[in-house]
Curated annotation (Swiss-Prot):
GO terms for molecular function: 4 iron, 4 sulfur cluster binding; DNA binding; DNA photolyase activity; metal ion binding; S-adenosyl-L-methionine binding. One of its GO terms (biological process) is sporulation resulting in formation of a cellular spore. This is Spore photoproduct lyase. Its cofactor is [4Fe-4S] cluster; S-adenosyl-L-methionine.
Length: 341
């Protein structure tokens, strides 16, 4: 698929006082993209659309260039100690995505230009924990790879972490646009993960993302560039024929990764879950979705901040975990399963 290009761009005035802000302003001006001003990346008004659904879809192709003022990093367990905030929002239209509710009324994509401030804060966290390793997740609230061909913020983060003694970087993507990252000086300190799923899930619930085959071609490229490789199987979803669907996923993964060094391969396994607010938003934004959001079939699990979520019942969740682990053991016997949640 073609790399993401926004249809509309907003700038905070302060963003233009940073080199990246100036560079992006010149780039989008040359591309002929409409540019507007906003007082804050948190308060973007005037996104076009006659209905809420139309405004939502237009917001997904709107980029906001701003300054990150909150420099206290969120926790990102179990993936990493901290989430490093390079961007917020995503151009994809995955029906199940938790950003549907965490970003709520702000589904536009935000990128932050004060990278030196962000990296300085990351260095403080690294120094506090040294000599322990400190891991940073760069894709907690965005698919950073999908927009990085425009900003190169992720590339700078890879090289910043690559130069540290005790920092490590990780991120996950559904996009194939990795070429500009292949020559980054990562020094083996970045784990590049791809989100994969059964054909059913990708075909029905992941519009606006790269195909499975394109993701795998990109995975071969990044492995060839010496990055540590990982796969996030998420969300693991019990559709009709799911056992066969996920078997074919791992079988095809093994086939397409033949000849790649998989000595340090990782898998992360995340079952499908949703909240009541998410269900409302998903059904509003994707009224024809085939996603099964029937609470009566699920177990209610309390989460952080008192917000509960619906996950599979214990027996079904165990069956999912055991099945995935058995497929991984068969096709990738030396891989590490980092967690199932």
């Amino acid at each position: 698929m073609k790399p993401f290009v926004p249809k509309l761009v907003y700038f905070e005035p302060e963003a233009l006082s940073y080199p990246l802000g100036q560079e992006l302003y010149e780039k989008f001006t040359q591309m002929g993209i409409e540019i507007r001003e906003t007082t804050s990346h948190n308060q973007v008004r005037g996104i076009p659309g006659e209905t809420e659904l139309a405004r939502y879809r237009n917001a997904k192709s709107t980029l906001v260039v701003g300054v990150r003022r909150t420099l206290k990093f969120d926790s990102s367990k179990p993936s990493a100690e901290y989430a490093i905030p390079l961007a917020t929002g995503c151009m994809g239209h995955c029906h199940y995505c938790y950003l549907q509710t965490t970003l709520g009324s702000k589904p536009y994509i935000r990128v932050y230009v004060n990278l030196d401030d962000i990296f300085a804060q990351a260095q403080k966290y690294i120094d506090e924990r040294a000599p322990e390793i400190t891991r940073f997740e760069a894709a907690c609230t965005s698919d950073i790879v999908g927009i990085d061909h425009l900003t190169h913020s992720l590339k700078k983060a890879i090289e910043f972490i690559g130069a540290t003694d005790y920092g490590r970087l990780r991120f996950v993507t559904k996009y194939e646009h990795v070429d500009h990252l292949l020559d980054a000086k990562h020094n083996g300190k970045t784990r590049f993960r791809f989100s994969v799923n059964s054909r059913y899930v990708i075909n029905h619930f992941e519009p606006g993302t790269s195909s499975f085959d394109a993701r795998l071609q990109a995975a071969r490229k990044v492995a060839g560039a010496g990055y540590k490789l990982g796969f996030v199987v998420a969300p693991i979803y019990r559709h009709d024929g799911w056992e066969q669907g996920y078997f074919e996923l791992f079988q095809e993964l093994a086939r397409q990764l033949e000849g790649v060094d998989l000595s340090d391969l990782t898998f992360e396994l995340i079952q499908h879950r949703f909240t009541k607010p998410a269900k409302r938003v998903i059904e509003q934004r994707y009224p024809k979705t085939k996603l099964d959001l029937d609470e009566s079939k699920r177990k209610y699990k309390w989460g952080r901040y008192g917000i509960g979520k619906y996950v599979y019942r214990d027996k079904e969740a165990r069956e999912l975990e055991e099945t995935m682990r058995s497929y991984i053991a068969r096709f990738f016997p030396s891989a590490q399963v980092q967690y199932f949640t």
